[in-house]
Regions:
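Noncatalytic scaffold domains of N-terminal-nucleophile
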Residues: 1-41, 45-47, 51-97, 161-162, ...
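Internal maturation/activation junctions in enzymes
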Residues: 16, 115-196
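A generic secondary-structure signal for well-formed alpha-helical elements
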Residues: 37, 41, 45, 58-62, ...
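Protein kinase glycine-rich loop
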Residues: 108
Length: 196
């Protein structure tokens, strides 16, 4: 929750409540962070003040503190990853591949809802939000089972964003009711085109 942490509470909930639609919010701290990067490069992150702030926050957070150290940042090596892309209607949607789960999950959600005309249903329609919510739950179930660091685990990216698989998963949304129990889909081997 945004209320848990003073910094997020102050930023996102000024005066104790969220901003109204149309309000403009600036982020001076983020602007200052970008200025530091432009002036000092990545060193400000790995061995400078930004890294020190991150380490302090991770180690001193009240809920589930971590053990991140300066050595961890200094020893970190950037790895380039192939993007994960999929078509949603006429748009090519791309994002970072594993170990990040974002691109796969977003492309799954979009693939699952693609058969629905959400604009026709309308933004304030409960059915629109049920479809989006259940599609998200299905994608997050797959994320929890199949997505990890591809340096250590074989992540079936192509199968997870396969149009036939996502159409099969979207069949679960036909109930007109919230899906009571969400389970990850069963990704089968190459020799079959069936999904469970």
């Amino acid at each position: 929750s945004l209320k848990k942490y003073k910094i997020t509470k102050n930023y996102f909930l000024p005066l104790g409540k969220s901003l109204e639609y149309g309000n403009i919010k600036t982020n001076v701290n983020y602007a200052n962070t970008l200025k530091l990067f432009s002036k000092y490069g990545s060193d400000v992150f790995y061995s400078g003040t930004i890294g020190e702030d991150i380490i302090s926050t991770v180690r001193n957070v009240k809920v589930n503190p971590g053990k991140l150290s300066k050595i961890d940042l200094l020893n970190y090596e950037v790895k380039e990853r192939n993007p994960v892309c999929s078509l949603y209607r006429k748009y090519k949607v791309c994002g970072m591949g594993p170990p990040s789960s974002g691109a796969i999950t977003i492309n799954q959600i979009l693939g699952i809802v693609e058969r629905y005309d959400l604009s026709k249903l309308g933004y304030n329609n409960s059915e629109t939000w049920r479809i989006i919510g259940d599609a998200s739950r299905l994608a997050f179930a797959d994320r929890g089972k199949y997505i990890a660091d591809s340096d250590f685990v074989d992540v079936p990216i192509d199968k997870l964003i396969d149009k036939k698989y996502l159409k099969f998963r979207s069949n679960k949304l036909e109930t007109k009711m919230k899906i009571p129990e969400i389970k990850p889909g069963l990704i089968l081997h190459k020799e079959t085109n069936n999904y469970i």
